[in-house]
């Protein structure tokens, strides 16, 4: 039996139930289509993220690699521009100017904070 499936993490970031900081959610609500960019993470994998002050500093050559815990084998603290763990924690806890805001390609479509149950009913 074949069933169609989708991955919809981005849609649930801007829900009341999501525990990300309000500033993180607001970054999604404020994002424009052209703000969604492909970044190369310190572990070498590409990902989509919302362009912000942090990514601008990284693009300008600033490094944010302190206190490496060697949590990801493919990350080399000698060459990585930033600690991905720290950047993700910064963003999720509300320090969006010093964090990495991973997102899906449709993050810019977020219009409001809504309840998960309402999203699920809309999809039913």
Features from the language model and the residues they span:
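Conserved active-site-proximal phosphate/metal-binding subdomains
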Residues: 3-124
């Amino acid at each position: 039996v074949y069933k169609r499936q989708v991955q919809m993490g981005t849609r649930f970031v801007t829900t009341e139930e999501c525990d990300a900081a309000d500033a993180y959610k607001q970054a999604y609500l404020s994002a424009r289509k052209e703000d969604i960019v492909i970044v190369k993470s310190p572990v070498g994998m590409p990902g989509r993220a919302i362009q912000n002050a942090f990514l601008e500093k990284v693009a300008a050559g600033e490094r944010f690699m302190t206190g490496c815990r060697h949590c990801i084998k493919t990350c080399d603290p000698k060459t990585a521009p930033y600690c991905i763990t720290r950047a993700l924690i910064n963003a999720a806890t509300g320090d969006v100017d010093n964090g990495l805001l991973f997102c899906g390609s449709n993050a810019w479509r977020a219009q409001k904070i809504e309840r998960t149950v309402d999203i699920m009913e809309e999809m039913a």
